[in-house]
Structures are given as structure tokens and as C-alpha cells.
Amino acid sequence: TIPSSVTSIGIDIFDNCDKSLEITVSCDSTLAKDDFGEASEKVTYRHSLVKTDAKDATYTEAGNVEYWTCENCKKHFLSDETDVETAKAVEQSATVKPVPVQVATATTQIKCVYGQDMDEINLQDYVKNADAVGGVSVKVATGSTMLDGMQLDGGKLSGKPAKVYTNGKDVTFTFTAKNGNTANLTLHFLVAKADPTVKVAVDGDTHTEGDLVSELKLILSGNNTKGLAEIISEIKALAAGENTLTWKFTPEDSENYNVVTGTVVVNAQTTTTTTTTTTTTTTTTTTTTPTL
């Protein structure tokens, strides 16, 4: 091998050498093939390679694939081919096994209620080695779908669930690090039915002892959830004074709202009994006849 320190050579110095001779020249040599005259076809430029063994990446430190580095030109290769014409150099980044994304294992179910603001979830909090991977971006994984009414913005999950999932729903998120590595995290959401908004009153200003409960009418006042309210008390008739009646509300949207019960108080007036007394006056007339 002719080292790179040799900068000139006699043009006919190899003319009488064996035809099978290979003239090896360092890859960084300044000598051109023409400098060897008729022996130029025997010249092969070669790298002087040093092997680096493969090393697995950890959650805190990058690893590398098996690769070779030329001692002379400092280029990197993924094979031990030394021929300059056939060896393909790669960027050093191609030899690196980047740090994998480490995400926490989600074991807790996330409980929400239909139509109510959920507690904001910062999905970045699930990444255990964000600094080592240079930060991550988050998106809903391919093939997975977000819950209706929820939004993902900048890695933060928020919103009002717009559909009940009493048996739960899994949503998978993909975390992508700046180094290109990815990891998935699946969260299990439980969305419970909401209690409807109900304000019940009994129709009518006055009620009397003995009024039949079955004839009382309930009215919904205020901003109520759509549905039907009915009295379900076993009381047949109102008693004098306060009567606590139980009602049941059945929402129209029974898929997303619970059936609820409550009570309403009805005041009943005492029945007034009027007694009429009749007085009879008898007049007796006495006639006196004088005696003669």
C-alpha cells in the first residue's frame, strides 16, 4: 500500500512487475492513476477501515449500528468494502440508533361525564424521557378515533364528551420524537350518562285536603332537559298540611341522560265544615173567660 505521504512516483517504476500485481493506494492519496503510467490499470484506491460494533440505544443514550470508519478520509460505511470505487459512504447520522420514546403505562381509566367539561389531560406528561429524545409531538394514531366532543391541541386533551361510552372506549395516541422514533399510548375512556337538569313544580296555586294525587299535574320550569316528569308516590289523596310527593323524570335522550327522581312538597288546606243550627220558637196564647 502506497501511503498518502507519497506525493510523486516514477512513471515506469512498475512496468516490469507481475501482471497480477495490485497496486494499493490510500484513499486520500494525491497520486492519480496516470502517475503510474502503464501500470495504472493495476491501481486500486482503498480505505483503511476501523470497525465499530453495534450498540443498542437506551432510554437515555443513543446507540449505533455496526459500521466502519476510514482512518484516512474519516468517512463512514455500513459494510467493510474498502474499494473506493464501490464502497458507499454514509452520513454519520445513518449509523446512529436514536433514543427510543419511553411512555408510561396507562393503568387508570379516565372517567368523564356526557356534556360536561373533562379535566384537561397533558399527554406530554406520559413521556418519561422527553429531554433525552428532544421533545415529542402527539397525534391520534392511525386507525384510532378521538371521542366525539374531545379535542387534541398541542398535546393537551380537552372538551366535552358528546357521546356516552358506559363500556369504555380506547383511543391510541402516537408520540413522535425529534429524532424520528415513535411510541404509542392507549388510554381507556369511560363516559357516563349525565344527570338531567330538572326543576319540578305542581301546577295550581291552592290545594285542598282530599285532592286526588292522580289529578295533580307537574310542570317543568326553568331550563330543563327535555323529557317527561310524573308523580310516582303511593299517596292517593292529599292530607292537610305538607305533602311530600316523589316524582320521576324520564329524559327524551335516554342514551345520554339518566332517569332521575326527586320530591316536591304540596301544601293542602284543611276542609272547612259549616254547621247550621235552626231554632224554633213556640208561642202559647192563653184566653181567660170571666166568671159571671
Task: Please identify what each model-predicted range represents.
Residues 1, 8-19, 33-39, 70, ...:
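Core hydrophobic positions of leucine-rich repeats
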Residues 1-8, 18-32, 44-45, 58-59:
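Structural signature of tandem-repeat unit edges
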Residues 27, 69-85, 173-181, 247-260:
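Enriched for extracellular/lumenal, surface-exposed ectodomains of secreted and cell-surface proteins
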Residues 41-101:
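Thrombospondin type-1
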Residues 51-65, 139-144, 148-176, 221-266:
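Serine/threonine-rich, repeat-prone extracellular segments and beta-strand-based repeat modules
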Residues 101-137, 190-223:
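Solvent-exposed, low-complexity, repeat-rich "mucin-like" stalks and linkers
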Residues 181-192, 260-269:
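C-terminal edge beta-strand
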Residues 270-292:
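Ser/Thr/Gly/Pro-rich low-complexity, disordered linker/stalk segments of secreted
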